[in-house]
């Protein structure tokens, strides 16, 4: 099965998406390596259904220790005090776009931290975004009904999106 190529509608980049924290993990290494992209993603499908029933666009998933991890389909980042944070990657697929964003931050002196962080730290973020092959860097408007930062104002996300677009343009020229 090959997924259809889809592009995030432009209005999503202006409005952002909503996330709902779910009680479903991405996967445990003893049952299914969460770092691998596999055909068996029942847990991610169930997480997405749970989030959509709660009125959200996607599910925010925690790791087995309760730290923020990933969404049901994309990697997750937050911005706090001018620093970009993402999970350790121990319980999520370490995507290509995720790594490109990490590399761009390092190359352009944007502080980037790959670390464990709590849901409460996430609620206090100035910005949050997802990374994925089709979504690039998609802003998050709210998590669990809590607005993240100032709606529609995402200076760090815009900076990273511009750097990412330039990288793609250079690589495909």
Model-found features: residue ranges?
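Helix-start/capping segments and mature chain N-termini
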Residues: 1-173
């Amino acid at each position: 099965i090959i997924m259809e190529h889809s592009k995030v509608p432009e209005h999503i980049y202006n409005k952002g998406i909503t996330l709902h924290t779910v009680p479903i993990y991405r996967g445990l290494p003893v049952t299914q390596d969460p770092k691998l992209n596999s055909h068996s993603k029942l847990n991610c499908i169930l997480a997405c259904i749970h989030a959509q029933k709660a009125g959200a666009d996607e599910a925010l998933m925690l790791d087995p220790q309760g730290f923020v991890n990933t969404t049901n389909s994309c990697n997750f980042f937050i911005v706090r005090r001018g620093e970009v944070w993402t999970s350790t990657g121990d319980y999520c697929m370490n995507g290509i776009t995720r790594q490109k964003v990490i590399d761009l931050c390092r190359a352009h002196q944007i502080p980037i931290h790959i670390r464990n962080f709590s849901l409460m730290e996430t609620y206090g973020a100035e910005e949050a975004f997802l990374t994925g092959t089709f979504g690039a860097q998609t802003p998050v408007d709210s998590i669990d009904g809590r607005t993240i930062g100032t709606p529609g104002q995402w200076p760090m996300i815009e900076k990273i999106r511009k750097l990412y677009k330039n990288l793609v343009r250079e690589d495909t020229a």
